[in-house]
Amino acid sequence: TCLVNNLPAQAGTKNNTTSNIVASSNWNRQSVMDIARRVADWQIKDYPENKYAKSEPRGWIAGALYMGMFDWAELSGDNTYYDWLRKIFNRQNWQVANRMYHADDVCIAQTYIDFYNKEKNENMLKPTIARADWVLNNPSNGSMDLDYSKGSTIERWTWCDALFMAPGVYTRLYTLTGNRKYMHFADSEFRATYNHLYDKDEDLFYRDSRYIGQKEANDKKIFWGRGNGWVIGGLAEILKTLPADDKEFRPFYLDLFKEMSERLAWLQGKDGYWHASLLDPDSYPSPETSATGFIVYGLAYGINQGYLPANKYLPVVKKGWEALIRAVETDGKLGWVQPVGADPKKVTRDMTELYGTGAFLMAASEIYQLAEK
């Protein structure tokens, strides 16, 4: 296994003597607060016009935004952002989305539980517990081979994005209630996905079983940037929300987190971004800020917790943060976000989406702790 601080130039972490030095004006807490506020405020202003906010306010696309917005509300201490979230959630009656088993449809519950932990209002929690208990009592035996023509195959976590959407619901419920049934279920399902989609030679996840054996133009395997961003972000959420003293489940997730972190650090582009295709960036040379945001979030969280050595990973995180900042327009719109999809696609600067902002705000909340006071 490579050591991150001995990476070759093409990995983009040591391509010249200045590449690792973030403009000092950006690497301080006030700057992090300012840019995060600008991004959050632009998104709130644009939210009513967003097609997914209109059609699926309880869906995963908005759900990933809510997670970042909650982190930002905590960081800023500004009740405006809590109020914005609470208003949306009250309108939804704190319900999860409709598909009983679908991981995407419980992503929002992670923020519901965080809100409950803050305000202790049981109405925030009841629908989530009802859904989780139903799934536990009626486990799906669908195949792990994703096939959209067979509904039972999306009842399991058969695509790697699901590892961000659902496990953090169950880790939170386990920590909140002390009931091990939630963690036994989540651990069993996560490991089924890991066994099916994780490539132990590459230390990366296939998006789903359809991509196993497929090749990019350069004859490398297809590993999607945002897909692996979802996983590293999801692992950070699992580690963050498991009980601190847990010794039964944590070791597996921590080992996987470290293994993937090392591989992802190696794959950062010279420009500081991770690209839509992790192993064929030449075919997809444009920045991709949803992958970059989730990966920066994961790595920064790892440094803050002492899981990843700062001397190796801080240069990677600084470079990634600088890249994210370059993608923000003066009005706060985050660009270069790959649209909804399942595999590498071309991205342009004008593309944005709710989960891209969510990833940016999650990253900002960890970067703030790393930045100079």
Region locations from a protein language model:
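Membrane-embedded glycan transfer/ligation machinery
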Residues: G63-Y66, A109, F164-P167, G229-I232, ...
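Residue-level signal for alpha-helical transmembrane segments in multi-pass membrane proteins
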Residues: C2-N5, L239, Y368
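Extended ligand-binding clefts on enzyme/binding-domain cores
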Residues: C160-D161, G168-L278, P285-V296, L308-V337, ...
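Bacterial Sec-dependent N-terminal signal peptides
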Residues: T1-T17
